[in-house]
């Protein structure tokens, strides 16, 4: 079949509709598998992040990919729950590592309950994700369950390696990074578990254990990098109410975003030394003048068009993702029903949605 055209005017409402429908199904199934009785501060808190307002992108992508390539989406519901559980566990641990104060419009688990409680909850959510991986054997058969386990192990390994890169750059005050370094981190930290893993899981459920699960990898890589850049841009420019996280938190935390790399490349020697000095200090070490330094960094990024350059890079990646997904969808089977047709249109429209979103 020919790839469905993605109209910008119709794309965003369609994407939001599909996200909402699949999120409702995924969250309901996820909550069914969280134990109701436990010691306090464990499973009760494991349900916190998944039930806060969010897109549910990863689970929806798994379900939509399955439907688009001839599968029944209900067979992919357990893998969709799996990716959402691992995602929320990563978020809890991210909030600990970053010292973040807000997540999805409310205090983070470490901010509200302390690091010790949050760390244990994150571990519990990972365990719940592992239990869902195990459940694939009963629901999908041993061969397909093993393929999904292999994909899960690969996703976790790549994500942890990406997180190690980012944490290491902050710890070592790395200030000689290039855009290539940033994209490598994006591929590992963001692309794998946000796009490649859900797409691969959906393809395997649709076509079986012998399927080529890599067909959407280039789409996932390009879109994952664009997604991360847009997330970084929103961190500096987003509306606090819609974004749901601390504005300019990346500058407080010293994260090496594409915009920060551009600033380090474009600043005068004196400005660059000031940036490096700011980055060398932890948030706790910066003292009462830190807010003024963050404001100065924002001003310098504006002066050197760092945000505009990042947006331009994201637009190029989105265009590449659109070409890749169009080529793959051209080989998809004719949609047998409305859900499959919407799933195909969802995948085609997703690239433009990624850079238009406000959270």
Describe the function of each predicted region.
Residues 332-359:
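Short, amphipathic C-terminal "tail helix"
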Residues 139, 209, 325-339:
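Surface-exposed helix-capping loop/turn segments at secondary-structure junctions
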Residues 15, 19-23, 54, 58, ...:
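Generic structural signal for well-ordered, non-membrane alpha-helical segments
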Residues 260, 321, 347:
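Hydrophobic, well-ordered secondary-structure elements that form the walls
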């Amino acid at each position: 079949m020919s790839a469905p055209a993605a109209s910008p005017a119709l794309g965003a409402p369609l994407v939001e509709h599909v996200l909402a429908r699949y999120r409702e199904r995924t969250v309901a199934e996820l909550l069914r598998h969280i134990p109701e009785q436990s010691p306090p501060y464990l499973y009760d808190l494991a349900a916190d992040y998944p039930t806060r307002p969010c897109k549910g992108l990863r689970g929806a992508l798994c379900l939509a990919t399955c439907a688009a390539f001839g599968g029944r989406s209900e067979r992919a519901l357990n893998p969709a729950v799996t990716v959402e559980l691992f995602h929320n566990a990563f978020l809890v641990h991210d909030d600990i590592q970053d010292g973040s104060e807000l997540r999805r419009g409310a205090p983070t688990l470490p901010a509200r309950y302390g690091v010790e409680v949050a760390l244990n909850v994150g571990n519990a959510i990972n365990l719940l994700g592992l239990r869902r991986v195990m459940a694939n054997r009963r629901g999908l058969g041993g061969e397909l369950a093993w393929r999904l386990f292999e994909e899960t192990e690969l996703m976790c390994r790549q994500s942890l390696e990406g997180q190690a890169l980012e944490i290491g750059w902050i710890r070592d005050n790395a200030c000689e990074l290039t855009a290539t370094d940033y994209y490598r981190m994006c591929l590992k930290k963001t692309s794998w578990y946000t796009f490649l893993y859900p797409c691969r899981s959906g393809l395997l459920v649709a076509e079986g254990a012998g399927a080529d699960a890599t067909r959407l990898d280039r789409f996932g890589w390009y879109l994952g990098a664009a997604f991360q850049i847009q997330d970084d841009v929103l961190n500096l420019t987003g509306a606090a109410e819609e974004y749901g996280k601390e504005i300019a938190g990346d500058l407080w935390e010293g994260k090496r975003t594409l915009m920060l790399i551009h600033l380090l490349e474009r600043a005068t020697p004196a400005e660059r030394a000031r940036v490096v000095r700011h980055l060398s200090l932890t948030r706790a070490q910066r003292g009462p003048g830190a807010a003024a330094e963050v404001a100065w960094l924002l001003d310098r990024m504006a002066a050197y068009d760092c945000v505009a350059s990042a947006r331009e890079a994201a637009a190029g990646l989105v265009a590449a993702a659109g070409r890749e997904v169009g080529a793959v969808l051209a080989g998809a089977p004719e949609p047998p029903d409305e859900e499959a047709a919407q799933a195909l249109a969802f995948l085609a429209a997703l690239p433009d949605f990624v850079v238009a979103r406000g959270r």
